[in-house]
């Protein structure tokens, strides 16, 4: 199956809206930053997208978690033409690596979703179609629920296997 890794990583960005991914790793090989991930046009790359009851007061750059930018990040569709498409086999694991040397430092789950480009090239797909969950992880231990009880805590990646029945 061919897909852009960003389509896979989009909801991982929702679950950890302070973070963004720039690299994917398949078969143990890390790819260059933004080779297979659409780059956002945000002036400050590491800038949280927020839910807001008062958007005029606390949104730094106009992106909200219930708007179109949450799918691939602000302005990311503009870089779709230069973003390469990686072929990943059904059943294979893909690891999404956080950018700017970040590690997850907030408690919470990791959720990974996929969306199929309806027709044509995935480069022309803006992510506005249907999504389905392929992976989730939450609490892994008896640690502190405000930190290290969560599987993702202090990691710089999220990994998921592409479902074997993916066309």
Functional labels for PLM-detected ranges:
Residues 16-167:
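Structured recognition/catalytic domains enriched at protein termini
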Residues 1-22:
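Fungal secretory targeting signals
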């Amino acid at each position: 199956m061919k897909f852009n890794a960003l389509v896979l990583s989009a909801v991982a960005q929702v679950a950890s809206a302070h973070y963004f991914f720039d690299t994917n790793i398949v078969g143990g090989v890390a790819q260059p930053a933004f080779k297979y991930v659409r780059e956002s046009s945000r002036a400050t790359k590491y800038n949280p997208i927020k839910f807001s009851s008062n958007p005029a007061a606390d949104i730094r750059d106009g992106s909200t978690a219930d708007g179109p930018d949450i799918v691939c990040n602000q302005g990311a569709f503009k870089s779709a033409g230069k973003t390469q498409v990686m072929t990943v086999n059904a059943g294979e694991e893909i690891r999404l690596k956080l950018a700017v040397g970040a590690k997850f430092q907030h408690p919470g789950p990791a959720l990974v979703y996929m969306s199929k480009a309806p027709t044509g090239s995935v480069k022309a797909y803006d992510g506005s179609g249907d999504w389905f969950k392929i992976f989730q992880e939450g609490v892994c231990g008896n640690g502190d629920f405000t930190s290290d009880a969560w599987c993702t805590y202090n990691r710089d990646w999220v990994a998921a296997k592409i479902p074997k029945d993916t066309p």
